[in-house]
């Protein structure tokens, strides 16, 4: 064999070995960074005072701090369930004295329910709804070594809805998810919610876990999807026991029109900010197509809301009035009340001035964590 051919074959072999190593090592890196539980990188809003991000205006942050003080000034009931794979999952419940329903707030990736819903907790409570703030598996007080992008979490939210049905019979439930939480509540549609779930809100969710992982690899980590993404997919299959490309929120939403699963479709609101720099706005445009008829019109039980100025998860803050109006239309379809409930002013056990201090000693002032 000519020397040149030997060189070509050796070069091709070396490239193949290199690609295989990148496939395995880069994929494992992706698994460790994206999937494995990492409490150091997670949102610490329950333990520490909230801090302002560059994308938040002073007005937005003031509303978020008000929500933080509103929740942290109350004592929570901690409730737990056992997931279908044996993990213990935890939620905090803040019951309204004259509850019209229960808002299940499902947070996003490496976040917390308080971090993602601080701007919404008080308006929701003021409508007469109890707050049910869950810790997704792999986050907070819930067990779990992996974050699964809805693969297992979709069953968790259905099980939480069943828990509420048993604990509070007849109480309507609203499933409300942001980012990965949005993907979770949409994927739950494909599992089958119990009949106490009367409405769903899905804010800035993705189409599939695989699609958002590829997008983040390319746009934010500046890494090639091949071979790293596919190596990561292999490690997820081996170690986390799910296939990131076999799960689709777009497909799950189609189940809302399945009469065998939902004799009466659950009204749903899809929301997304145009300036979302993390989950592409186009993903919600694709998801909403699952809720259109053959002529491209939204099905009667669906709502779509967008804010021109909102970044990731900020539509509620950037267009509060428009978002609340969309919730009102959603609730009208669901037969749920949404007018404000008057009640005596609540005085937190801990003064609000203390709860919102930047140098707050969390061990001394917080009533819950």
Question: Model-flagged regions — what are they?
Answer:
Residues 13-82, 341-344:
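An N-terminal hydrophobic leader/cap segment in hydrolases
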Residues 109-123, 136, 282:
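The serine-hydrolase catalytic nucleophile loop
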Residues 110-113, 139-168, 172:
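Catalytic nucleophile-loop/oxyanion-hole region of alpha/beta-hydrolase
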Residues 123-143:
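Conserved alpha/beta-hydrolase
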Residues 187-245:
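Hydrolase active-site cap/lid region
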Residues 256, 262-264, 268-272, 276:
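Short beta-strand/loop motif that positions the catalytic acidic residue
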Residues 278, 304, 310-324:
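Catalytic histidine-centered segment of alpha/beta-hydrolase-like enzymes
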Residues 280-293:
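Short alpha-helix in the alpha/beta-hydrolase fold that links the catalytic acid
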């Amino acid at each position: 064999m000519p020397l040149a051919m030997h060189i070509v074959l050796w070069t091709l072999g070396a490239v193949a070995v290199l690609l295989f190593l990148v496939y395995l090592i880069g994929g494992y890196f992706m698994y460790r960074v994206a999937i494995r539980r990492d409490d150091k990188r997670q949102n610490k809003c329950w333990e520490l005072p909230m801090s302002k991000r560059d994308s938040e205006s002073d007005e937005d942050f003031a509303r978020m701090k008000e929500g933080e003080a509103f929740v942290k000034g109350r004592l929570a009931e901690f409730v737990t369930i056992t997931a279908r794979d044996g993990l213990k999952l935890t939620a905090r419940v803040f019951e309204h004295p004259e509850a019209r329903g229960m808002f299940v707030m499902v947070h996003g990736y490496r976040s917390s329910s308080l971090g993602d819903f601080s701007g919404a907790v008080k308006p929701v409570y003021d409508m007469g709804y109890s707050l049910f703030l869950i810790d997704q598996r792999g986050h907070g007080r819930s067990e779990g070594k992996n974050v699964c992008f809805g693969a297992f979490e979709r069953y968790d939210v259905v099980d939480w809805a069943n828990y509420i049905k048993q604990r509070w019979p007849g109480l309507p439930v609203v499933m409300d998810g942001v980012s990965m939480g949005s993907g979770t509540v949409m994927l739950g549609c494909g599992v089958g919610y119990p009949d106490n779930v009367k409405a769903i809100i899905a804010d800035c969710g993705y189409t599939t876990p695989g699609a958002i992982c590829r997008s983040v690899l390319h746009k934010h980590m500046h890494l090639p999807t091949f071979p790293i993404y596919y190596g990561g997919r292999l490690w997820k299959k081996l170690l986390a026991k799910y296939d990131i490309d076999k799960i689709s929120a777009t497909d799950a939403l189609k189940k809302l029109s399945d009469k065998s699963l939902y004799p009466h479709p659950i009204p749903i609101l899809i929301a997304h900010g145009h300036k979302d720099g993390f989950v592409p706005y186009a993903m919600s445009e694709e998801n909403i197509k699952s809720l259109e008829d053959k002529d491209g019109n939204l099905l009667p039980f669906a709502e779509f809301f967008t804010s021109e100025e909102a970044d990731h998860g900020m539509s509620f803050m950037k267009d509060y009035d428009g978002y609340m109006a969309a919730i009102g239309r959603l609730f009208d379809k669901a037969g749920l009340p949404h007018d404000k409930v008057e009640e005596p002013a609540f005085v937190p056990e801990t003064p609000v001035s203390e709860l919102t201090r930047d140098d707050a000693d969390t061990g001394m002032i917080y009533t819950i964590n």
